[in-house]
Design a protein with these regions (language model features):
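N-terminal FAD-binding dinucleotide-binding subdomain shared by FAD-dependent oxidases/monooxygenases
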Residues: 1-257
């Protein structure tokens, strides 16, 4: 089973994982698969048109559901694509002036995908507050460490490949990387470990330079993007992520005995 899981993980990484970071041939396959699934399951051309996005596949997070197309075609379901203008006592009024009466309104508007450790208070060296460090944009070194915050490590931090690969797999690889750093402290070799600012700057510059090739910057609005339109995603291959997480380069860290 482990071998099967590893094989399927690598297959996914070599198809979808490459599609989202600029492999046009793989992206075409993803889009063709999504389109064929829609056409096979929704016969009404008007509804099918409403269900067809006006942005590239995977620009927003793809949702895999075995029953959504069947549910949306039931007599008691209606797909409304008009923007919401306001919520009134009797229901929701859309921008075309139509009032959609309802008994219950469920606000499934998502979450803050860029909060990470916030709103928890985290104070680093010299009293620096994480909220201030991340006031404009969220960055970390290799997604797990922050300059000026010794002995602090996180899983699934900024620019982790949450939109490319299995969240479980990437968390396990990040944890293995972090544990190698913690073992230095447990062995008494160091008292403090934190990312060097220059190393973090180089890492984040490489992320920014590669992001222009990805699907996340092709024009849609999603929770992948921060307020400046920067995706907190991983713009490289699965193999590179695995290599980066195999062992820490101690030259990238400030080690205090």
């Amino acid at each position: 089973m482990d071998e099967l899981h590893a094989s399927l993980t690598h297959l996914f990484a070599d198809t979808f994982g490459r599609a989202v970071i600029g492999d046009k041939e793989q992206m075409q396959r993803v889009e063709d698969t999504c389109r064929a699934n829609l056409e096979d399951n929704v016969r009404d051309p008007e509804l099918r048109a409403k269900l067809t996005p006006d942005y590239q596949a995977a620009c927003k997070r793809l949702i895999i559901s075995p029953g959504f197309y069947q549910a949306i075609q039931k007599p008691n379901a209606e797909l409304v694509t008009q923007p919401i203008d306001r919520v009134e006592a009797g229901g929701v009024r859309t921008r075309d002036g139509r009032l959609h009466g309802m008994d219950v309104l469920v606000l499934a508007t998502g979450f803050d995908g860029h909060s990470f450790m916030r709103p928890m208070d985290l104070i680093g060296r010299d009293g620096v507050d994480l909220k201030d460090v991340w006031a404009e944009t969220t960055q970390a070194h290799r997604s797990i460490s922050l300059p000026g915050f010794p002995n602090y490590f996180m899983l699934v931090g900024p620019n982790s490949p949450i939109g490319n690969f299995s969240l479980i797999d990437i968390s396990e690889r990040q944890l293995s990387y972090i544990m190698q750093l913690i073992e230095l402290w447990r062995g008494g070799e160091v008292n403090e470990i934190s990312a060097r600012q220059d190393a973090a700057d180089r890492f984040n510059a490489s992320i920014k330079a590669a992001m222009g090739n990805t699907v996340w910057v092709t024009g849609c609005q999603s929770w992948y993007l921060d307020k400046h339109g920067n995706p907190a995603m991983w713009p490289f291959t699965f193999d590179k992520f695995c290599a980066d997480m195999s062992a820490p380069d101690l030259e990238e860290y400030e080690l205090v005995s």
